[in-house]
Amino acid sequence: MKCRICGNERGNHCHVAKEMMFGFRDSFDYFQCTQCGCLQIARIPSDMSRYYPPSYYSLTRVTPPRAAGGIRGWARVRRDAFAVVPRGVLGKILHWMSPNEELTEAVAKHLPGDGIALAGLRRSSRILDVGCGSGSFLRMLHAAGFRKVQGIDLFLEKTIEYGGGLRILKGSLEDCSGEWDIIMFHHSFEHLPDPLHTLTTAARRLARRGTIVVRIPLVSSYAWERYRVSWVQLDAPRHFFLHSTKSLPEVAARAGLRVVKVTYDSTEFQFWGSEQYLRDISLYDKGSYGQDPEGSIFSHEEIQRFKVLAEELNASQRGDQAAFYLKKL
């Protein structure tokens, strides 16, 4: 098989992985390139709709918070704006008095490390989230006063109109016009069939000093080495490309982009999910830790050990996912 990233055809290693999120258990051929390290599906299924049912986690419709008018609504926006971009004395005081912990955690998750500074995030930033599902993170940003935000996802049933100018379009990156300061791919890039075309298109849509944030699972990780086809973030067949720390920068460079920072942000999920797959337990099984933590096969102590190990792997750059911050060459 010829690598669709670097073109190498020699010595590539074949693997057979099963669909295990929903427990369909149908098999798919993958291969790993011996040159760039990218693990990729051999043949993309002609119809992927079966693997993105309405219950797929990112497609679940979120309900926007009820807008509070007057001084209360104004204060909430100031508080939440500070939670995203910590500037302003009033916002700081309001945040201290009544912090929006959900928003703070969401920002830390979506822009890990010093992502806010790297992306140059401001309330005036033009932000595009590609493959955002129903747009839960954008909804939070919009409620915090970030008005120039938009999402797009190919697998939505239809375009979502949240009101106040927030729209999540049904479509692909090619359907988006205009120029953007921040373009985000939060665990969506690996679902797309042509990484080079995607990043080239994103680079054309990016402002001169803009930033592209690509958060992806990494095959150059301890989890892949340990679990192989039972690695939970292989996620056959939805993940077409599982990049390495060599293949992603290579694609970025060909698209006219450079990697300015890599922040590892893997979690305990890489362990409990993969351990379940080894035991033929799907993510949506009633005995899954994700469905019923108390009824799962894991003790509280085991989950805590998984969390500690994930932190250690991130520190040694061996975690199974990371955020790549890209800028134009």
Predicted segments, located by residue:
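A C-terminal cap/extension of S-adenosyl-L-methionine-dependent methyltransferases
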Residues: R4, V16-G23, Y264-L329
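Conserved alpha-helix/loop element of class I SAM-dependent methyltransferases that forms part
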Residues: A81, V85-V89, I93-S124
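Short catalytic/ligand-binding loop motif for oxyanion handling, primarily in non-cytosolic enzymes
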Residues: Q40-A42, S49, S136-R139, K158, ...
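Conserved SAM-binding loop
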Residues: M1-C3, E9-G11, V107-R228, P237-R254, ...
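N-terminal juxtadomain amphipathic helix
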Residues: M1-R79
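Short glycine/proline- and charge-enriched loop/turn segments
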Residues: Y227-D235, Q276-S282
